[in-house]
Amino acid sequence: MMKQYLQIKEQNQDAILFFRLGDFYEMFGDDARKASKELDLTLTTRDKDKNKPFEEKVPMCGIPYHASDAYIARLIAKGYKVAICEQTQDPATAKGLVDRDIIRVVTPGTVIDAACLEEGRSNFCAGLYLDDTCAGFSVCDISTGKTHVTAFQGPDRAEHLLNELGRFSPAEAVVNPAAYQCGPLLSLLQDKLHCHVERLSAGRFQLQEAERTVRTQFGDEAAGRLPKGNPAAALSLGALLGYLHETQKTDLRHVDDLDYYQQGQFMELDLTARRNLELTETLRSKEKKGSLLWVLDKTRTPMGGRLLRSWLERPLLSVTAITRRSAAVGQLVDHTMVREELALALSGIGDMERLVGRIVYGTAGGRDVVALKNAMARLPHVKELLSAFDRGRLGELAQLDTLEDLTDLIGRTLCDDPPFSVREGEFIREGFDPEVDRLRGILHGGKGIIASMEAAEKEKTGIRTLKIGYNKVFGYYIEVSNSFKDQVPETYIRKQTLVNGERYITQELKDLEHDILSASDRVSALEYELFTRLRQELSGHVARIQATAAAVAEADCLCSLAAVAVKNNYCCPAVDESGVIEIHQGRHPVVEAMRPDALFVPNDTYMGCTQDRVSIITGPNMAGKSTYMRQVALMVLMAQIGSFVPAKAARLGIVDRVFTRIGASDDLSAGQSTFMVEMTEVSDILHAATDKSLLILDEIGRGTSTFDGMSIARAVLEYCADPKRLGAKTLFATHYHELTAMEGTLPGVKNYNIAVRARGEEIVFLRKIVPGGADRSYGIEVAKLAGLPDAVVSRARKILRQLEEESGRPAAAPAPREDQVSFAAVAEGEVIDRLRRTQVDSLTPLEALQLLYELKKKLT
């Protein structure tokens, strides 16, 4: 047996080998040591030589095969690959050693077991190809069969590859040697995305073989959509498919829907922008709560959740496609009863995509198939609800296939509550198969059958004392007393002589004995055979099931966006090609959702193609500059996925890319300081942005000396504003108040500030964006709010006055009087600030009434 193990292990050196022995998966040698450490398993040995030290014996450990999913999940999470070696021969019929073989290699990017997967997130394995002229990118989620591929050419090919990796965030990537040697690419994969990288030889990226593999998997029509002038798409996809076939040992028939997309179909976002805008997870905690996805995701199915995440990762650039989607959201907003009933109907559908994936793989159990049946049973009601809409995208979704024939097939075949394992039996429905029913009758009614046979033999022979008994030596027998042995028929075969009688057998009794004793094994084997046939038949309908699952997922997403729009009072934006960003009373979607009891101060925004193209925003820290800039970017993204936006009204011209330069930390591992990171990011932005891009730039130049920083900030601002160089719409937050002088001298530049009301040595943040530059920085006041000791704050004020006297001017030039915020806005801000600081639970009724009088007085 160990020789067989070593032969199989030799072919799977890079994986932990799960070697099936009876009801256990065993691991030996180094695999056992690793598994023992990672899985907290007891390390033992098969060597029985008591004289040999333990450290010289071959170590081993094992796990029950029925609990393997949880153990595999833990190993995969730690970055290991697991090769599963099964017994491919029935031990009962094997002559000598049982045949074994690898049935599948589980890697981080090829997981299909529910225990290893996150419901609302796709698990992609990527294929990357890079050379001197082009780059290819492909991803496949084998748990659902979804496959995407694209390719790039030119000097920016590697940058586009990086952005696609940030978009899909694969769990594993297979790469060609040139891609592996690309430092930024490898760093992104391993250090930031924590992606398992599999380096393949150059021989695995041969165009002719790649094209053949793609054609075999997807067909001629799909393969023909790949670009003829750029072989990188086929090379990356062909190598990826080859790797999947090699590790999964199956034809992957559910991987049959190829999405080839081109640059220009979707907004491109780099990893920095995705993280700064917190699209799918927060920057600090890496949690979904607090992200834009958390606000928008009210989906009822796992596949709907994954699709919504995909929409957020791939904002559209086509006005037609955006309007089509937002119109469907609008229909659901207007039809409250249909929307709410649809949400309820979707709630019980579950994860059809991944269920059908496990069915194709042959790993689905009876409970998985019944779960699919229960999901499909809800489809007629979903179709009925969608039929309320006879036009637009919802009208198209109403044409979904309800799969009633498959629901009926599963319902006729399987019982409603099958056992955990299909090897346990008792899951084929009664009446479906006559032989199963007969064997079950024998199995459950053995005593009754024997009693009936005994009565029949008594009547046939006339022997009143005849009885049928059983023992382990002879099995079933017929016992006749000596007084009646002369009446025994010739068909009886004497088996044993007793003092008081004789024991006989008959052929009929032996056949019945065989049936009774073997019924359990036979019925289990027959039920498993029938279940396997059912799985195979369902696998033949995989394309139908996937198409329906896709329609359900889209309906779920549209329903979610509509529910959020209604709950949060969003508006439907007008999306066009104007290039204008015009928002009336816009709000930050996440901030207001995280603080539902607080009053969010809305703000207007106008950014044109020529006038007001660049907004210089000044004001103290904590006043809300970053929140305001992010909310503009998030509303653009929301509009371009077809969502409503948090505003009273909005007109949003298509933005091709959103760039952010917000905050930084020293990248010590790369030997880069905060300032170097900042300058690198700014450089990347200025090289990649276009006049259709939106730039969010916060505190450019703060990581160096004042004059250096101010010079860089001004030069960057001039470059962004100049239509001959870039001319991109830019939100530029700064503490360099000298830059406000550029309004009026640099076309397209407009000054704004965050309104602040000073009351003695205290300040109130009004959170309102108003025209004009800030009159001062309020740095010392912010320091006081942060809790610096009074002595430090007092000393800082003295030093500030001294510096102002020495320089002959205040720390910042006062803003023009006409740009000051109105008294009403100030009063409103003071009221909001007072309410936020009030501990409501500690107020007496009289104190609460007094507070209301005070607040009302401020507003009147």
Which residues make up each language-model segment?
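Short flexible coil/turn linkers enriched for glycine and charged/polar residues
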Residues: 11-13, 76-78, 119-121, 130-134, ...
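ATPase nucleotide-binding head domains, primarily ABC-like/P-loop NTPase cores
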Residues: 29-32, 230, 300-301, 311, ...
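Intracellular alpha-helical coupling/juxtamembrane segments of multi-pass membrane proteins
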Residues: 322-325, 345, 349, 446, ...
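Conserved catalytic alpha/beta cores of large enzymes that bind or transform nucleotide phosphates
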Residues: 165, 170-179, 184-187, 199, ...
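Amphipathic heptad-repeat alpha-helical coiled-coil/stalk segments that mediate oligomerization
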Residues: 202-217, 267-271, 283, 374-452, ...
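Active-site phosphate-binding and catalytic loops of NTP-dependent enzymes
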Residues: 85, 108-117, 251, 389-393, ...
